[in-house]
A protein has these predicted regions:
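Soluble or luminal CAZymes and related metallo-dependent hydrolases
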Residues: 13, 105, 193-203, 296, ...
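Active-site regions of enzymes building and remodeling cell-envelope glycoconjugates
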Residues: 27, 45-48, 69-70, 234-242, ...
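Hydrophobic/aromatic beta-strand patches that form the interior of the parallel beta-sheet core
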Residues: 29, 49, 72, 101-103, ...
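Donor nucleotide-activated moiety binding/catalytic core segment of transferases
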Residues: 55, 199-202, 218-266, 270-271, ...
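Short acidic active-site motifs
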Residues: 35-39, 245-249, 303
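Conserved catalytic-core segment of nucleotide-activated headgroup transferases in glycan assembly
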Residues: 137-232
Length: 311
């Protein structure tokens, strides 16, 4: 059984993984995360690959072990920003002892787990991310855009901490973050920076839409964001707010991507799309160095508009 977290983000890659495993004569089940408590015990698989290992799902993992399943983690989040804090809390809580193996996005994460003494070296494997494996294999295929919008500039937002779709409030998000190893004081500092950046992102979009009136802008909220946060942008004739569809189909069909520390910039790089980031909204508390290196960093809206005019 492979647990699927967010279908818009994860289903393509995990389906590819399931296909590869099935070709090796394995029977594979893709199980929605919120149905795993019922479906996994009913299937009683030999192996369960869960999407993360944190306090909220430890009871599930323990039950799978009791029923005789091997349990591994293929973390769909890849890496948290405060990796030192995350692994310290995760390891000190003892929950890593409940699994048989861990599949990481890269060697940094693998080495951190091993160096913390959380799991032995022969139980941790740097496998990469199925989402990017899918892109690597299929990036040359034409993607079908179900909304039939052509020649658009894609703006991907990345502010679920401020604007959660599945939590009742920011306080609940902070509580959830604390449970998975994020320090509360750092979260509160980050929220201040995220709030400023999110409102700046909306202002930026308005300015670009008014400056480049002949361009179509598609604002695609993060899968874990509430899209109503951006409803004021829908008043602009050349701006569309669309959460449906996968990031792959939107990125593959766009003429350029605008983002702020969003991992879809990695996907855009596979498709060799122009990638722009509003440097004036970024801060050290938000910055992801690897993603920054993929992007053209603009110092203001006017500079970004000049770059976009060339596309």
């Amino acid at each position: 059984c492979i647990i699927v977290d967010n279908p818009l983000r994860d289903l393509n890659g995990l389906t590819k993984l399931a296909s590869v495993l099935a070709q090796e004569s394995n029977q594979v089940f893709l199980v929605p995360m919120y149905f795993q408590g019922h479906d996994v015990p009913s299937i009683a698989p030999d192996i369960v690959i869960t999407n993360f290992l944190r306090p909220p799902n430890v009871d599930h993992v323990k039950k799978y072990r009791i029923q005789g399943s091997l349990v591994g983690v293929l973390d769909t989040e890849g890496i948290c920003k405060d990796i030192e804090s995350y692994w310290h809390v995760t390891n000190s809580s003892g929950i890593l002892s409940t699994i048989d193996f861990y599949l990481t996005w890269g060697l940094i994460q693998k080495n951190k787990i091993v160096n913390e003494g959380a799991l032995s070296k022969n139980r941790v494997f740097a496998t990469g991310c199925p989402r990017y494996d899918f892109l690597f294999l299929f990036r040359k295929r034409a993607q079908t855009n179900s909304n039939k919008i052509d020649n658009y500039i894609l703006i991907n937002t990345n502010f679920p901490l401020l604007n959660p779709a599945y939590s009742k409030s920011m306080d609940e998000e902070i509580k959830n973050g604390r449970q998975v190893g994020y320090r509360e004081d750092l979260q509160k500092i980050q929220i201040m920076h995220v709030e400023k950046a999110a409102h700046g992102f909306i202002k930026m979009t308005k300015q670009l839409a008014r400056t480049l009136k002949n361009e179509t802008f598609v604002v695609r909220p993060h899968p874990f964001e509430d899209e109503t946060f951006y409803s004021e942008l829908s008043k602009l004739k050349n701006v569309k707010i669309i959460k449906s569809g996968t990031s792959i189909e939107w990125v593959s069909s766009c003429k350029a991507l605008i983002h702020l520390n969003c991992s879809t910039s990695v996907e855009a790089s596979f498709y060799k799309k122009p990638i722009y980031s509003p440097g004036w909204l970024d801060t050290s508390e938000l910055r992801e160095a690897a993603l920054k290196n993929l992007s053209t960093i603009c110092e203001n809206v006017d500079e970004m508009a000049l770059w976009l005019k060339q596309q």
